[in-house]
Regions:
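Glycine/small-residue-rich loop that forms an oxyanion/phosphate-binding "nest" at active or ligand-binding sites
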Residues: 67, 78-102, 107
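Glycine-rich phosphate-binding loop
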Residues: 49-87
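N-terminal beta-loop-helix "entrance" segment that forms/cooperates
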Residues: 34-55
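Glycine-rich phosphate/diphosphate-binding loop of Rossmann-like nucleotide-binding domains
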Residues: 2-41
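Short beta->alpha connector loops at strand-helix junctions that form conserved
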Residues: 9, 65, 86-89, 114-115
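Short glycine/serine/threonine-rich phosphate/pyrophosphate-binding segments
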Residues: 14-18, 42-46, 65-74, 93-96, ...
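Structural motif
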Residues: 4-7, 33, 59-61, 81-84, ...
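C-terminal binding/interaction regions
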Residues: 3, 9-16, 20, 96-169
Length: 169
């Protein structure tokens, strides 16, 4: 099985955040790979990865980084594939530095950016992109969204049972 999504993180310290993306891709049965590459420590390897990703069959790249967070932008500069950036909380600025680094890209080098530590939404966005050309995946994703809706419906039913003197519903 060949991966169609690549999850790249600046270091394995980002793994606890990025596992959420991996679990969602696994649940949706989307083949993926996970690797650590650093825009600052392994710049040549990042360039090689980005330039060869499409040829290897990758369709979407999810790139996570904290602090200066150059990784998603460097990857985007070296590929025509969509890149989804995940700013990782981990510095004294609670990930805001990473968010600004990833979201402030120059024209022509976009990185679709999710919330700080938003790996789950990054995977969801990747699945939505892939589902445009994959009817089976689109059905799986629709079922996933229906499940999210059902959780809220159930929660509201449970909240009806919560009693307070001045609660009106």
């Amino acid at each position: 099985m060949k991966p169609i999504v690549s999850i790249i993180m600046g270091s394995t310290s980002d793994l606890p955040v990025m596992e959420k993306a991996a679990k969602l891709l696994d649940e949706m049965q989307v083949p993926f790979e996970m690797n650590a590459l650093s825009a600052h420590r392994t710049p040549a390897e990042v360039e090689t990865f980005a330039k060869g990703a499409a040829e290897r069959g990758i369709k979407v790249i999810i790139a996570a980084a904290g602090m200066a967070a150059a990784l998603p932008g460097v990857i985007a500069a070296n590929t025509t594939l969509p890149v989804i950036g995940v700013p990782v909380k981990g510095s004294v600025l609670d990930g805001v530095d990473a968010l600004y680094s990833i979201i402030q890209m120059p024209p022509g080098i976009p990185v679709a950016t999710v919330a700080i530590n938003g790996a789950m939404n990054a995977a969801i966005l990747a699945v939505q992109m892939l589902a445009l050309a994959d009817a089976e995946l689109a059905q799986k994703f629709a079922a996933y969204k229906e499940g999210l809706k059902n959780k809220i419906v159930k929660a509201n039913e449970e909240l009806k049972e919560v009693k307070y003197a001045y609660k009106t519903n």
